[in-house]
Amino acid sequence: QKLMKCLSKQDETGVGDTKSVAPVNTIIQSIKGVSSSKEKDSSKVKSLTESVDTFLKSRYDFRYNVLTEETEYRLLERMEEGFAPVNQRVLNTFCLEAHESGISCWDRDLSRCIFSTRIAEYHPFKLYLEELPVWDGVDRLAALARRVSRDQLWVKEFHIWMRGMTAQWMGVTGSHANSVAPLLISTEQGYLKSTFCKSLLPPALQRYYMDKVDLTSQGHIERRLAEMGLLNLDEFDKYAPTKMPLLKNLMQMASLSLCKAYQKNYRSLPRIASFIGTSNRKDLLTDPTGSRRFICVLVEYPIDCEGIDYAQLYAQLKAEILAGEHYWFTKEEETELQQSNMTFYRQGPVEDVLRDRKSVV
């Protein structure tokens, strides 16, 4: 503005005011200095960003987990150790290493790179299934089911359920959620029921298994359906009959509408997790109409949980789904489930009296 006033004054007189020339030149030089300073600052920021980016890429491999919403890293020199989440402690270590390499930066400079959209996204379950080998054609599902029981109906039902679990991981279920849950039952202790449930997930996906399922908060369990791969209703008999309507509703959900703590808006997320359960009691079911949601199986012997060929097991399931094999239970198969589950109903007071009278007669 001062420059414009001086120039305007010169225009009015028609003659340059020698007294005002010096201030005008000073203002021009000042403007040039500010502009030059901004260019230098911009150049420094760009140089620092490039230095930080080059430093990180020279030492680490990064990826963004869309399920946990975490950035993960691994050392390029020790890639066999796998990925781990980037937390504040790790970020501070990155910053110290950058300083030791001669880069003058703050942890916020590193954060801008690490927690940006420049880090490639990945879905743990889809990545695992994409990297599977081609199925060799050998059926491994029947043998896995027979580790629990030799009952032929169980072998067939378990196979369908495993397809449903894998289909949810693949994101191809559409309107057919995996709405059925196997219940492994034995009155004897030490049959490794819970261990078998956990062993169904390959090592690369073990962190997405949970056996502490809280049915007191619907919002909490819905988040787990979107984040985990398998939820074990361990000691199924501890859940009150009043919780069964909520559980059956959760089992039928194909998609979820969630709002996380740090977010303002709800968003639709696909369901990933399936249910499984264990119990040491046989009298589990209370609702005959809801029994089609469970595959009750009596465990006949301690379960062998070792030596599972995960790569070929899931390659088989993936191949069957892509070939069009159904991963949901038909009406006929649901009827078979209800008939098979008759021996696992919980007797009420009236049934107990009638049973006692029959035994006397």
Predicted features along the sequence, with ranges:
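N-terminal nucleic-acid engagement/recognition segments and initiation subdomains in replication
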Residues: 1-139, 152-156
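Short, functional C-terminal segments
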Residues: 3-6, 15-30, 160, 164, ...
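Charged/polar, low-hydrophobicity segments characteristic of intrinsically disordered regions
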Residues: 7-8, 14-22, 191-203, 310-313, ...
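Intrinsically disordered or highly flexible coil/loop and linker segments, enriched in small
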Residues: 9-13, 171, 323-327
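Glycine-centered small-residue hotspots that permit tight backbone geometry or close packing
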Residues: 67-71, 192, 279, 290
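Feature primarily recognizes SF3-like P-loop helicase cores of small DNA viruses
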Residues: 96-102, 108-124, 177-180, 207-210, ...
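P-loop NTPase catalytic core of nucleic-acid-dependent motor ATPases
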Residues: 116-226
